[in-house]
């Protein structure tokens, strides 16, 4: 087993602790509902996490020099075990919470956590009119204007450079890139979400939401977001996945029994997912650690965060009102 993962297993036992009650939930709002000041503050905080002087790496995992790089590395490390699997939604719920905690603790962010309401905005107009695609240096994530290589050329992230590959190696820096696709944006439409929300069990719902609503949001933005492993390098990844989590919570809130409804495989099937998983971190590195005693996802399944946050179980993240998550969607 990978040495770093072994250390994380040991750390899990030490991290078990009594949590404070969820009495002051963090607010999550649509990006379009944030004030200009809140948008500026959020963007500034994400840039802070990318700055080694302000947010140096906590562990240096995979050669990371910043907390932002560590966030990306945590995702790359387990691509085959957090996509097209039972843990897809729980893992990303915890990942969104970890990113929020880092923004607040490392960079002093105090505002609401934003999501991209793709359904509302897709109904209102084409992708190029989306509220997130704004070239403002303080209130957007870059416009649809790109250079010949697809690199972002305006907004606050023009100087972002990414250095990780899917084998967790550090490589020559590349720009934050995009490749916009209107036909993929249409896969996030509310009618598709409604079909998912009508499903009765978690496995079916997870498969539905993890299909075109998930991939459509990624591929609509494209470029860095096209890559299933490296996509957290784009700040828009977190707004997209926070919206997916919001939709999962809408489904859960319909029936209390859904707060314990989990299932699915622990390992994504097929060559595609095995091909993007780092060769040094195969199935045998993760399956024993997940604590499911097999390939079926259970509430006891451990969510691994590569040392940037404690590792907790799916049971602890199933309810957004839980002590571990403690959020309110507006």
Per-segment meaning from a language model:
Residues 19-330:
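Intrinsically disordered, flexible peripheral segments
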Residues 1-21:
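Fungal secretory targeting signals
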